[in-house]
From Swiss-Prot:
Entry coiled-coil feature ranges: none
GO terms, biological process: translation
GO molecular function: small ribosomal subunit rRNA binding; structural constituent of ribosome
PROSITE patterns in alphabetical order: RIBOSOMAL_S18 (PS00057)
Protein's job: Binds as a heterodimer with protein bS6 to the central domain of the 16S rRNA, where it helps stabilize the platform of the 30S subunit.
Keyword rRNA-binding attributed: yes
Database matches in NCBIfam families: S18
Cited InterPro entries: Ribosomal_bS18 (IPR001648), Ribosomal_bS18_CS (IPR018275), Ribosomal_bS18_sf (IPR036870)
Name used for this protein in its record: Small ribosomal subunit protein bS18
GO cellular component: cytosolic small ribosomal subunit
Origin superkingdom: Bacteria
Gene: rpsR
Length: 75
């Protein structure tokens, strides 16, 4: 039987020692949204709940300030 092992998910913010997620760091926030503009869930990214909440708030704030788009395109 062939078995495959998934890579263990880890929280990038805990590993790097980041305390607060900044809404102005657009390059980092883009890693956590899909091409359609949706926030990627923590079960996919491996982010801890504390940082997932901060990430969600930062993305929503960046969207409100027009730093990130709400959707990919409007048709």
């Amino acid at each position: 039987m062939a078995r495959y092992f998934r890579r263990r998910k880890f929280c990038r913010f805990t590993a790097e020692g980041i305390q607060e997620i900044d809404y102005k760091d657009i390059a980092m926030l883009k890693n956590y949204i899909t091409e359609n503009g949706k926030i990627v869930p923590s079960r996919i990214t491996g982010t801890r709940a504390k940082f997932q909440r901060q990430l969600s708030r930062a993305i929503k704030k960046a969207r409100y300030l027009a730093l990130l788009p709400y959707t990919d395109q409007h048709h």
